[in-house]
Structures are given as structure tokens and as C-alpha cells.
A protein has these predicted regions:
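Poly-acidic low-complexity segments
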Residues: 1-4, 68, 116, 129-131
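Extracytoplasmic thiol/disulfide redox context detector
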Residues: 2-104, 140-163, 183-197
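Thiol/selenol-based redox catalytic cores and closely related redox-interacting motifs
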Residues: 101-187
């Protein structure tokens, strides 16, 4: 499986692509020091159920995707998911966070405060480019939206690492699976097949 990672520093955005990993696509990635135990990973799904997310699809297989509007790898995963959602019976719940760049928070807020949040996410991804990243214009978030985004970011941090995209789902074996970084289309199909109905 090939995974692509996004690393961030206080100075901005740094990308590191094409890192080969020996773990299978369905494995929980190697936890970092001070990362949550498997029991805490199970609690992630409960927390995600109360997070501020935007759903696409109506299938029984629920996949959470924590993403930043300005994340290039999130954009790639978003594009890889589009042709698979309906035929594979998936519901993707997009959980926006805003921390990668100065405009990330405002763009994430624009998504959550839009009249049609899914249409806002689609516009952000359709107009994504490497000069300005996400295609939405940033807004000044309301205090309620800022709190919602802080809550979403706290869930991302509870995975043990603040890497986007992070995919989370319950497997057919009843385990909570956390995948950090991007997947290629073949691996994405395997993930969607592994999600419990």
C-alpha cells in the first residue's frame, strides 16, 4: 500500500509524498508515543457521531474523513472517493478542521456556515489549486462555528497525530480503524469493502 503523508510545522505547509509502508491498508497505523490505546480509538466513533460533519451518500457503510480545506492530499482522497461512494454503498462524513494555513479556519467555517454545506465542500474541491489551495473564500467564523471546528480538531488530535486526511470507520470485525494519510484508488476500494454496514 502506498500512503501519502502531510506534515505541518508552525511555518506552514510541508509535503512528503510516496512513502512506502509495509502495513496493509486496513491496519491501524502505527501509534505515536502518547497516542490513544485501541479502547480510546473505539471512543473516536462515538465522538465523531457528535462532531460537526457533512454527509455525502446514503449507503450503510459510514466512513469519516477528517480534512483541512487547504490540504492537497485531502483533495486527492476526496477525488478518489467520488466515483466509489454510490456503487460501494458508502456514506462519507466529512469532518472539517482548519489548521494548516492562515485561510484554513475561514474556509472550514465557510463550509459549515453555508446554506448547503456539501455544495460548499464540492466547490472547494472543484476549484482546488496549488496556488490558493481550497477554492472557497474564507469567512470570519461565528463563535458557534469556531467552537465546532475546535471540537473537530480535538477529535483529530485524539487519534494521536494531527495528520490530514485521517479516515476512521468501524470494520466488519467490529474494530475501529484509523488511517492517516492518503490511499490510492485500489486501497480505497478495500477500505470501503471493509466498513461494517
Amino acid at each position: 500500500m502506498r500512503m501519502r503523508y502531510l506534515a505541518t510545522w508552525a511555518t506552514g505547509l510541508t509535503l512528503c509524498a510516496g512513502l512506502p509502508l509495509s502495513q496493509p491498508a486496513l491496519a491501524v497505523t502505527v501509534p505515536a508515543q502518547n497516542s490513544p490505546s485501541a479502547e480510546n480509538h473505539a471512543l473516536l466513533l462515538q465522538r465523531l457521531g457528535h462532531a460537526h460533519w457533512v454527509a455525502q451518500g446514503k449507503g450503510p457503510h459510514v466512513l469519516y474523513m477528517i480534512f483541512d480545506p487547504n490540504c492537497p492530499y485531502c483533495h486527492v482522497v476526496f477525488d478518489e472517493l467520488q466515483p466509489l461512494i454510490k456503487p460501494m454503498g458508502a456514506t462519507v462524513r466529512y469532518v472539517p478542521v482548519g489548521y494548516l494555513t492562515e485561510s484554513s479556519l475561514g474556509k472550514a467555517a465557510a463550509m459549515l456556515e453555508a446554506k448547503d454545506p456539501l455544495a460548499a465542500i464540492m466547490k472547494n474541491e472543484r476549484e482546488f489549486n496549488m496556488e490558493h489551495f481550497g477554492g472557497l473564500r474564507e469567512i470570519l467564523p461565528s463563535s458557534a462555528t469556531e467552537k465546532a471546528l475546535e471540537k473537530n480538531l480535538a477529535i483529530l488530535r485524539a487519534t494521536g497525530q494531527s495528520i490530514v486526511p485521517t479516515l476512521i470507520y468501524r470494520s466488519r470485525q467490529g474494530k475501529t480503524v484509523v488511517i492517516r494519510g492518503g490511499l490510492d484508488t485500489r486501497d480505497m476500494r478495500s477500505v470501503l469493502r471493509d466498513i461494517a454496514p
